[in-house]
Regions:
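Small-aliphatic-rich amphipathic alpha-helix that forms the alpha element of a beta-alpha
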Residues: 37, 102, 112-160
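Short, hinge-like loop/turn segments at secondary-structure boundaries
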Residues: 69-70, 163-166
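N-terminal amphipathic, basic helical "cap/leader" segment at the start of enzyme domains
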Residues: 1-94, 199-201
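Short, flexible, mixed-charge acidic loops at enzyme active sites
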Residues: 66-67, 108-113
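C-terminal helix-cap and adjacent tail motif
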Residues: 4-17, 170-201
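A general secondary-structure junction signal
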Residues: 53-55, 100, 178
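Short acidic/glycine-rich loop or secondary-structure boundary segments that cap or lie
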Residues: 61-63, 104-108
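Active-site-adjacent structural patch at catalytic or cofactor/ligand-binding sites
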Residues: 92-103
Length: 201
């Protein structure tokens, strides 16, 4: 069975070797990314996901200043492997910062007390779907990306530097750009160990 949705999923891979040469305009990328998040479902239609796109100097500042300084103070051994990784991220075109609005999450906890213990989980599920939606949308435009998680180490400085709300919780950083080298075939584990199909009660 041929399915365009699954085909787009198959194009979405973790790509580390990226460059800053893209044919798309920044406005086109903004529309693509923000639309993907807007169309992502969320529990109770809470729409808790927030995003900030870093282009140009803002993208460089994140990786060359904020993340580098933070990790430099934590890594006690050889810093060169980390340095090389950060340089690779900086060479990409941009970064999407994914946040969740905890003020909205808290409001839904109060409005729906029966489900209050679940809203943190609901929020994280919504964010995960938004991240996948953006990642896949970029892949369909032949734009590579890798998902990073330097939170919570960089949260405070990111929010302070760009004057973002304190109640936004940073969950991930999606680095994207043109693909210099595509990864090899993805290893997929056996379905026998992962899935079941049932038809009898």
């Amino acid at each position: 069975m041929s399915n365009s949705f699954l085909k787009s999923f198959k194009t979405r891979r973790t790509v580390y070797e990226l460059s800053n040469q893209l044919s798309q305009e920044q406005g086109q990328l903004e529309e693509l990314i923000f639309s993907a998040i807007e169309l992502t479902p969320s529990a109770f239609n809470s729409q808790t996901s927030r995003a900030v796109i870093l282009f140009g100097d803002a993208h460089l500042y994140l990786w060359q200043k904020i993340v580098r300084k933070t990790l430099r103070s934590l890594v006690t051994g050889d810093f060169s492997p980390t340095e090389n990784k950060l340089k690779a991220f900086a060479q990409a075109y941009g970064t999407v910062l994914f946040f969740e609005d905890m003020q909205v999450v808290d409001r839904f906890k109060k409005d729906y007390p029966t489900y209050a213990p679940n809203f943190i989980s609901f929020s994280e599920q919504s964010s995960g779907m938004a991240q996948l939606a953006v990642w896949t949308a970029l892949a369909t435009e032949s734009i590579g990306a890798s998902l990073q998680h330097y939170n919570p180490l960089i949260d405070d400085e990111v929010k302070a530097h760009w004057k973002l709300p304190a109640y936004w919780k940073l969950l991930s950083q999606l680095v994207f750009g043109s693909i210099k080298s595509f990864p090899g075939e993805k290893e997929i584990r056996s379905r026998i160990a992962r899935f079941h199909t049932l038809s009898e009660a």
